[in-house]
Amino acid sequence: MIGTILFIIFISCVFFFIYRLTLKYTPKLFFNKEGEIAKIILKMKSAKKPYHPTPWLFNKHLQTIYGLRLRGRSSYKPQREDVFFKDGGQATIEYFVKENLPDEAPIAYIVHTLGGGSRESCTNFMATYFMKNNYRVVICSCRGCNGSKITSRRLFNGYQTDDLNTIILHVKEKYPKAKNKFLIGFSLGSMVAAQYGIDCNESDIDGIICISHTIECFKGLKLIETPLNMKLYYRPMMNSLKNIIKKSTYYSDEEKKEIMKGKIFKHYDDIVTSKNMGLNNAEEYYKLLELRPKITKIKVPTLFIFSEDDPFSNPEWIPKDEIQKSKFVAFLTTKEGGHTSFAQGWKNKVSFSEEVSLDYCECIIEIKKK
């Protein structure tokens, strides 16, 4: 009896493994066929290519944890530079650049996830991939992140874009001959990138890519407030925020004590983020992050790369009606991919999001040449 059960389990595992090896998905695309974005999307080969998720990452949590923490990073050591802001704050940006790269090379600016930087897998591998393809890559670290000195009370959030704009203009001044510039954001960074698509004026950004935007921030936070998700995601992210506060000399011992009690983002955002922004509470801040009202205001070609199994979001929240009214926004979705991961093939040498992002930028460059 036990032997029969074990045999059935073994056969089931074999069939499941074969199924995973052969599994592929055709990405779904949502965009206005009459809009400016259409000519870019229709030119992209990667948007029509089947996505083969990594067989052994067979659920959204494995994909996400692998993509955020376990994929590792390249051995490349980027150049670091401090950028200073008008209010006395600063951030440390990093350059991923090939030797003898011409000044005319396109620039890819990357905004990391919450509390991350070039040390996180998704940011590091995207930067390395673009660098190998002759882009000058700039990791736009936020205040307090990636080893940046904390020199102001204000830290980072997913709405204000003035720090990012300062970094972009600083790099633009250093490399005025660069013909094309792109902005890529992951998770919280994608919220900043999307907002920059509305706020940008003098930066000449040619295209924006937003990877794993939660779409509905408040609802997304509720999704990860389950016991399992709290252990898998919430605790490490909250610890990252708390570590920044611990290092800061701009918060009193009483404030720090209160912040350390928090177990969810709302607690932190009520005390820190909302107050630094001049808002009353976290709810006001989360409302500013909602994507739906922004879609028709974005004025730069912007591609959202989204996985339907993202543990921080829900495909039902995709603002399809607003996308059809926009000239500049497209959504590319996959059945699998987790949050910021999109691992593909057995070894995942290049993730699906990396492949799509480069293709998107290259198509824009080609179109602009004509």
Please identify what each model-predicted range represents.
Residues 154-175:
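Alpha/beta-hydrolase active-site loop
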Residues 337-350:
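Catalytic histidine-centered segment of alpha/beta-hydrolase-like enzymes
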